[in-house]
UniProtKB/Swiss-Prot annotation:
This is Arginine biosynthesis bifunctional protein ArgJ, mitochondrial. It catalyses: N(2)-acetyl-L-ornithine + L-glutamate = N-acetyl-L-glutamate + L-ornithine; L-glutamate + acetyl-CoA = N-acetyl-L-glutamate + CoA + H(+). This protein may be expected to contain an N-terminal transit peptide but none has been predicted. Pfam families: ArgJ. Keywords: Acyltransferase, Amino-acid biosynthesis, Arginine biosynthesis, Autocatalytic cleavage, Mitochondrion, Multifunctional enzyme, Transferase.
Length: 436
């Protein structure tokens, strides 16, 4: 197994989530190398993805909402807008330096990365999206990157090892590379999807410190792909939190090249069935990638699923789940294995919901749902506290995975899921030492 020596020590827990093989889309090659961005002189820090199919690919992207958008975010967003998502064939990524808050030079460097990638891989102008991740405020070692891009040409391929090398090359404080792949069927045609992501800290909704890209050989219009990606991201990468910080760089990109054939999937009525089937496939895929980011949360010992049900709206349900997920008091209680449901209620109470009827205290219930299949443990039922068996609660909190169900009892029937982790001493250590 290829392991990035520049990332935190690969733990036994994390190794469970690194695949030993995969299925990969037709017409794409990927790779990763060390070019000299990272200080240790050997860790992979430059990755590329390229469409080798005989026709241009379509792309969609979702970017950070942070006001201090990094140079690669601005450059990539402009490229997507200029081309309406059509004719995007490559992604170039460096790790170890965010190229954020780097002024005009940062913009020039991001554009240069795209131009050199276009040239090396034989694409027409403006065919490449750029991503960077790492320390904010430092200029890129751009000469190292630009001389490294041509070296990628001989290191790309479509094997599992190539995909794993690509996933490793985008890591920073991650403990393991995040790679997911799967095959699926639409209208009798078999398609494949594969993707990588990075992120372990500075993760919260609306695109935080994470990068991710996934590709498929299904034929999808750029407009349909953008709508599907936005829907999927809202229910995956924008439904996770590690520490509540939103980064300057985060980007999720989807690319479809149509190499597996079949009818074009568009967003019109004649394609409705295939459109919604693809939306389901992309959403579940994005959720798997996003959940790997949470599992690798800096210093995390628990993976927590928050399920809010019977809300008046999806927006209310997600807002409440997000409020709990970003509560430091809740997260530290989970690390301490303390069934302090008062912290959950507190976070529910100050969440940003739409109306006064969105939360009715005497209809609200909170339950621990064990992931080992044993009996759930009610903590609060219709606003009334239960007599909690602390020994049973402690038993549940010993599990690595935990689900907490919040039933709002509004009669609205809407629900949302959100994924988070606990907050530990190690999180402080990792981030206190980040630049050293």
């Amino acid at each position: 197994m290829v392991v990035n020596k520049g990332i935190r020590l690969l733990s036994t827990k994390a190794a469970r989530f690194v695949p030993s093989g995969g299925v990969y889309p037709k017409g794409f090659v990927v790779g990763g190398i060390h070019c000299g961005v990272k200080k240790d002189g050997k860790s992979p820090d430059l990755a590329v993805l390229h469409n080798t199919f005989g026709q241009d690919a379509n792309a969609a992207a979702v970017f950070t909402k942070n006001k201090f958008k990094a140079a690669p975010v601005q450059v990539s967003a402009a490229t997507i807008k200029q081309k309406n998502g059509v004719g995007i064939n490559s992604i170039i990524v460096n790790s170890g330096n965010a190229n954020a808050v780097t002024g005009q030079k940062g913009m020039e460097d991001a554009r240069a990365m795209a131009m050199v990638t276009d040239s090396v891989f034989g694409d027409h102008k403006d065919s490449t999206l750029v991503m960077s991740t790492g320390v904010i405020g430092n200029k890129l070692p751009i000469d190292n990157i630009l001389s490294g891009i041509p070296k990628l040409e001989s290191q790309v391929g479509d094997s599992h090892d190539h995909w794993l090398a690509c996933a490793n090359a985008i890591c920073t404080t991650d403990t393991f590379p995040k790679l997911v792949s799967k095959s699926f069927e639409i209208n009798g045609n078999t398609y494949t999807m594969a993707g990588v992501a990075k992120g372990a800290g500075m993760i919260c909704p609306n695109m935080a410190t994470l990068l991710g890209f996934f590709v498929t050989d299904a034929p999808v219009s750029a407009k349909a792909l953008q709508q599907i990606l936005s829907y999927a991201t809202d229910r995956s990468f924008n439904s996770i939190s590690v520490d509540g910080d939103m980064s300057t760089n985060d980007t999720i990109v989807a690319i479809a090249n149509g190499a597996a054939g079949g009818d074009l999937i568009d967003n019109n009525s004649s394609c409705a069935e295939s459109y919604f089937e693809l939306q389901k496939e992309v959403t579940s895929f994005a959720q798997k990638l996003a959940q790997l980011v949470v599992r690798d949360g800096e210093g995390a010992t628990k993976f927590i699923t928050l399920k809010v049900k019977d809300a008046l709206s999806y927006k209310d349900a997600k807002s409440i789940a997000s409020s709990i997920a970003n509560s430091s008091l809740f997260k530290t209680a989970m690390f301490g294995k303390d069934a302090n449901w008062g912290r959950i209620l507190c976070a529910i109470g100050y969440s940003d919901v739409s109306t006064a009827q969105s939360i009715i205290p005497d209809r609200t219930s909170v339950t621990f749902v064990p992931t080992d299949g044993s009996e759930p443990l009610p903590l609060l039922v219709d606003g009334e506290p239960e007599s909690v068996d602390e020994a049973r609660a402690a038993q549940i909190l010993e599990l690595e995975d935990l689900e907490i169900e919040i039933d709002l009892g509004t009669g609205g029937g809407q629900e949302a899921k959100f994924w988070t982790c606990d907050l530990s001493h190690e999180y402080v250590t990792i981030n206190g030492d980040y630049r050293s």
